[in-house]
Amino acid sequence: MTEAMKITLSTQPADARWGEKATYSINNDGITLHLNGADDLGLIQRAARKIDGLGIKHVQLSGEGWDADRCWAFWQGYKGPKGTRKVEWPDLDDAQRQELDNRLMIIDWVRDTINAPAEELGPSQLAQRAVDLISNVAGDRVTYRITKGEDLREQGYMGLHTVGRGSERSPVLLALDYNPTGDKEAPVYACLVGKGITFDSGGYSIKQTAFMDSMKSDMGGAATVTGALAFAITRGLNKRVKLFLCCADNLISGNAFKLGDIITYRNGKKVEVMNTDAEGRLVLADGLIDASAQKPEMIIDAATLTGAAKTALGNDYHALFSFDDALAGRLLASASQENEPFWRLPLAEFHRSQLPSNFAELNNTGSAAYPAGASTAAGFLSHFVENYQQGWLHIDCSATYRKAPVEQWSAGATGLGVRTIANLLTA
């Protein structure tokens, strides 16, 4: 390993020879980042991306001004999916170093898991990785159940079974119970539900290559809520939380589900499938039914659910939907505290009725007459939340993954959302 490049911080502008807008400069001692007080964390992250682009793979964060948030901003921009990087961290107090170490362990797990090829990360592997992560931070305070294949059908998990039956890799439901109270009868404070589609071809409503090539990341919601629970535990979560991951491949085969199929759920809802590429909501419905049965104070689901959310927000914000204004406000406050980008999009009662079917109670996709695709998807999910008007948040994870690098991120997963959800759980 080469000698480390020193990275220092300065509140003074760069020498004029570097240009009026220079955010970093290079000298005999290393690289200096020039903070301007306007968006220092963003500046650090963008500079780190440029430093990585220069091929510098060993750095030392040196001098005054570094804290956990600034170190983390550097790492978010510096980390990439290829090669190895080494950072020598500055001296931090014990609490800040522990916070940084937990972010490095858990949010890097989220990014690496989302980036993993679908060939090595199927439904069972995703569920087991989630169990391993949570068990590592929670020890014996965790119990779990994994249900897969035909057992899902026999137990009534018809959405998950229907979507996943076309793959040779069985669909899987992970139900994990984090109970730090030691009381088996303790009330459940929150339930987290994640979409874990480990590869999404679109099924018979097949995607074009340009839309399929990133679909190893369609389990980003499951990874995000798993990371959020783990991170909340490291921050002292002392309430009971249950995690439900709905994991499957969405593939084409002689056994795959088809347009016109009707799925009957355990809550009595019948859904006509008119787009096999709107599969995420079909598997989440099973998880939301289980979550509702726990009678928690809050339910949070996370999913890379719609292209419509990305059309509205790009890859820069997660989309938030809720009927509960107070709870939505709390999550947005948590996002602000954690410097993570969330934006609330509309969800109204009329979105719940914009999924008409001639043969069932619901269609799994909105018709051309109702083009608000992200809102109608949230409206669909609300039919599987018992008390959907209170205590329920839906996150359409549009900021989970980037197909190409940008000035502050490498290509691949971002890990955004983990800290916000953990903040809300521990508030």
Curated annotation (Swiss-Prot):
Its EC number is 3.4.11.23. It is found in: Cytoplasm. Its main location: cytoplasm. One of its GO terms (molecular function) is manganese ion binding. One of its GO terms (biological process) is proteolysis. Its cofactor is Mn(2+). One of its GO terms (cellular component) is cytoplasm. InterPro entries: Leucine_aapep/pepB, M17_PepB-like_N, Pept_M17_PepB, Peptidase_M17_C. It is an enzyme of class 3 (hydrolase). Gene3D superfamilies: Zn peptidases. Mn(2+) 2 binds at residues 195, 200, 218, 279. Mn(2+) 1 binds at residues 200, 277, 279. NCBIfam families: PRK05015.1. Homohexamer. Belongs to the peptidase M17 family. Probably plays an important role in intracellular peptide degradation. This is Peptidase B.
